[in-house]
Amino acid sequence: MDKILEGLVSSSHPLPLKRVIVRKVVESAEHWLDEAQCEAMFDLTTRLILEGQDPFQRQVGHQVLEAYARYHRPEFESFFNKTFVLGLLHQGYHSLDRKDVAILDYIHNGLKLIMSCPSVLDLFSLLQVEVLRMVCERPEPQLCARLSDLLTDFVQCIPKGKLSITFCQQLVRTIGHFQCVSTQERELREYVSQVTKVSNLLQNIWKAEPATLLPSLQEVFASISSTDASFEPSVALASLVQHIPLQMITVLIRSLTTDPNVKDASMTQALCRMIDWLSWPLAQHVDTWVIALLKGLAAVQKFTILIDVTLLKIELVFNRLWFPLVRPGALAVLSHMLLSFQHSPEAFHLIVPHVVNLVHSFKNDGLPSSTAFLVQLTELIHCMMYHYSGFPDLYEPILEAIKDFPKPSEEKIKLILNQSAWTSQSNSLASCLSRLSGKSETGKTGLINLGNTCYMNSVIQALFMATDFRRQVLSLNLNGCNSLMKKLQHLFAFLAHTQREAYAPRIFFEASRPPWFTPRSQQDCSEYLRFLLDRLHEEEKILKVQASHKPSEILECSETSLQEVASKAAVLTETPRTSDGEKTLIEKMFGGKLRTHIRCLNCRSTSQKVEAFTDLSLAFCPSSSLENMSVQDPASSPSIQDGGLMQASVPGPSEEPVVYNPTTAAFICDSLVNEKTIGSPPNEFYCSENTSVPNESNKILVNKDVPQKPGGETTPSVTDLLNYFLAPEILTGDNQYYCENCASLQNAEKTMQITEEPEYLILTLLRFSYDQKYHVRRKILDNVSLPLVLELPVKRITSFSSLSESWSVDVDFTDLSENLAKKLKPSGTDEASCTKLVPYLLSSVVVHSGISSESGHYYSYARNITSTDSSYQMYHQSEALALASSQSHLLGRDSPSAVFEQDLENKEMSKEWFLFNDSRVTFTSFQSVQKITSRFPKDTAYVLLYKKQHSTNGLSGNNPTSGLWINGDPPLQKELMDAITKDNKLYLQEQELNARARALQAASASCSFRPNGFDDNDPPGSCGPTGGGGGGGFNTVGRLVF
């Protein structure tokens, strides 16, 4: 029968005839044949299968072999034995090479035919060894795929025990050697299919024998981390990623990133090659593992690797966005790489030139998937332009291309950036070693205490959080200038963009410290604030005068010129201001005008003067302040000095003698000639007589609507103190007024009225006083209620002819001295005026913790407030503008907008507040601000910043939407951006070195948690890095001196 079949397949008979005869041969297989005939038939069919010249011959061989093996199984079992199979695997078959896939297919088919025979067990044992040998020989993808098919069908052939681990490792190495040089789609598809079969085999082995998984993954890492330049592992290894359980991510990444045997060069290679895996079309979860490794490296602070890999691979990842199959994973990795690379715009700017073309291409195809992708990409681009807003020339084409897609809110952008930063990645393994010192979750930067410099830190943070002021400072062009404003701009830029948790403002401190301030000793923050604003103001005036004299020359501003501020200020202020355009930045932001009006009670003539102020110093009403004074000498008692004047803006310390006028009556602000009895109280207030001071009727104001303390005492509010500040005052006794009309000292009535309100209203609560009798400094510990919404009474002057004729309105920052009233000259005429209640929102609160100005600690609460707020559109509609009357400027609760104001306060209560405590910045709430003194009696509000609210933006050129102020802040100049980028790189290097040092010491060091950057490095003294409401946990005794 074998001779007939052999002659038939090689004959020239027609193919249909051959098929009929072959069918007859197959049907005859059920007839009896002796062993020799069967063996001859098996030899012939094997030759036809392996060496057939055409598909017909090979098909005939398969059909006949299958038929005769089924009916003559013992004979086929004897033929298909271990020796025969081993010969095929070692020598091949005649001219057929042993690595030919046909041989493996033949063995695969032979196993199916003898599956029920006992001898198959011997073949299984043989093949367990042989398949391991074959894999070690690095078979080509096609042969490896056929081997995978065989082992998938016959799992008994897979090596067992320790050999299974070796087999998996060798199979991983084999996949690492796969290559496909063809560019034809059909061949590429076939290659991907072959790789998929091999990876599926590994998955099955891992499931059956879990012990093989970890060694296999170690082999994967060994392959991709190899630094051998002669070998580049195949991207086909990406096919294995989808089979690794996601539950193992944490364990594996921690093992990789903390293994001291893994060198940086190897880790860099591994990460680069994993990013290359994004090109593998069918791989799943590659992006998940890549991002996990990126986060793991950030957690152990290996920033050098992250920087190198990001710059090397960011363009490749962006390029993968063009390919639909790998686009989702590529976008996820691109987003993480860009959002975490926050110390420099370098990575983002590598892809900026390619963004517009990509956006236009996807917009034109109109597919829903493309639109959804562009929405995600647009959000990413907005985040990056927000973070690096100093490059309008690069970003304008991108903004134009993505203008039709939604822009995320600023809050969302900040949240995304904060969560993505390298320094925000937690490391549970290192938790017992050190707290990561990256930016806090707030995204804000602290200021390092340089030695009792909390008075400066708290003020700087309050000014930085004054959004409009910060933006104006950052927008100034001060290149080539060494002025104090330039140093403030530099400090603001670092607070906004540094990666550090806290910044050390050494240069600014040395430049801004008043000469009389002793270094490393506690100072008064209010005094420092006044000095700082005055210095900035005078400096700008000098520059403007120099610019007017030398318009064609480039101004050089140096420290030496700044030292001449005091001497030149008087000369420069002789020129009166004529327009807002001539105002300095400090005048625009913090400058207001206060009119002092004095009326002689004898001749009824009046005199007045308008002066500028940068802050208002508010004294406490005598009744409450005398009851709750803190004294360094417990035996001393307060001494009341009568006849003093209230100061509006004081350049010196706020610990000047706080003197209260004992004859102050009710709150009446009437600049017109009023024939009524002076001191008649308005309906909502009453005055109680106090005869503790001889010959004076010391009247004390009590607001009926102020919250009551336990025991019936009232808690004064800032509104009350402001009312008290603006209340009329009778000048008598030693404080009599010299009337030029009467040519003698006379009793007089003095009133003060705000005629021009500032953008930012600074209020200082006069808590520190000097007792001249006992020679001790005292602090008033009264709790003061802080309203979120404050209405400032501003008296608009509609006719000022008489005033302008007799007095020029000088805008200089000098104090209203106590003898000012006696120097005022009579005006002779009255002017019409009307009062407008200007709404302000509480922006910042500087708190003093302690019992004396020479000790204790400062910290501040603050929040972001811009010039406009949607809720205040309605507010301005409810404002009433009325002519001045005897009670027009009272700030009581019965004002027309009181109900609406209360509603606004409720809305503002829920807004985000920050607690700035030197290096530490935390989230807090307004409730914490309100309750600080009740929780910590020695922690009291001291300096307040209120932001004026506009129905429309009143600051020209400060519109965040104008130009390209991506994040509301102006773009940083190149000089500042370069400095920040350089420092951020330095910071990352410092963190990495520290992390490596800790890792080396971890094995022998005891695990004791002591956060660095908190209070370890702070200098000794009365000022420390923590404390205060909202974050406090210290007891009262421990908070006196930190």
From Swiss-Prot:
UniProt note on tissues of expression: Highly expressed in skeletal muscle. Expressed in adrenal gland.
GO cellular component: cytoplasm; cytosol; nucleus
Catalytic residues in the record: C454, H857
UniProt cross-references to PANTHER family, sorted A to Z: UBIQUITIN CARBOXYL-TERMINAL HYDROLASE (PTHR24006), UBIQUITIN CARBOXYL-TERMINAL HYDROLASE 38 (PTHR24006:SF710)
Family from the record: Belongs to the peptidase C19 family.
Assembly notes: Interacts with isoform 1 of FBXW7; this interaction prevents FBXW7-mediated degradation of MYC.
Protein name as it appears in the record: Ubiquitin carboxyl-terminal hydrolase 38
Gene, per the UniProt record: USP38
